[in-house]
């Protein structure tokens, strides 16, 4: 993996987030967990001169990875080529609490700064956690979203991370 400046990237964030699945990973090489996400945001927020480059990810309270993101100052968000869709599907449907799920995939964990990503990632953002909040029922104007996405009222936690380093394949 090669480190680049975030400003060198050129991609459609809507396509990347919505069409390509990503992994959110937190912890150390000795103790980490990862999960698949297909919802998220990229942009800039807080600060002068256009704001800080940020990533927003959403994690349900019952996800094992939440504990790792909560306990870590850093997390990674990584994007993969289409050929790894089966691996990402596995990581999104199995819990690291119950098994060493990464060993059931072809992905190879590697350390990046204060966190972990995988060798096969075509793009990895190393993010420093800036904000943690929770989506609430009261905040919804369109109540159909609750019916459609939260029948168990297990509203996502929102994590905003500042992109400190960017790595490409």
Segments predicted by a language model, with ranges:
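Basic, polyanion-binding surface patches
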Residues: 1-169
């Amino acid at each position: 993996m090669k480190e680049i400046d975030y400003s060198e990237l050129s991609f459609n964030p809507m396509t990347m987030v919505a069409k390509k699945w990503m992994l959110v990973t937190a912890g150390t090489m000795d103790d980490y967990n990862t999960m698949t996400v297909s919802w998220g945001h990229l942009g800039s927020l807080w600060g002068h001169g256009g704001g800080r480059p940020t990533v927003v990810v959403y994690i349900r309270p019952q996800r094992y990875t939440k504990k790792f993101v909560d306990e870590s100052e850093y997390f990674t968000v990584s994007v993969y080529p289409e050929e790894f869709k089966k691996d990402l599907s596995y990581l999104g449907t199995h819990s690291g609490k119950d098994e060493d799920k990464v060993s059931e995939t072809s992905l190879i964990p590697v350390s990046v700064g204060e966190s972990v990503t995988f060798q096969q990632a075509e793009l990895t953002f190393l993010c420093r956690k800036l904000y943690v909040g929770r989506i609430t029922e009261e905040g919804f104007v369109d109540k159909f979203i609750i019916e459609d996405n939260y029948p168990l009222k297990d509203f996502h936690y929102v994590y905003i991370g500042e992109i400190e380093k960017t790595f490409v394949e």
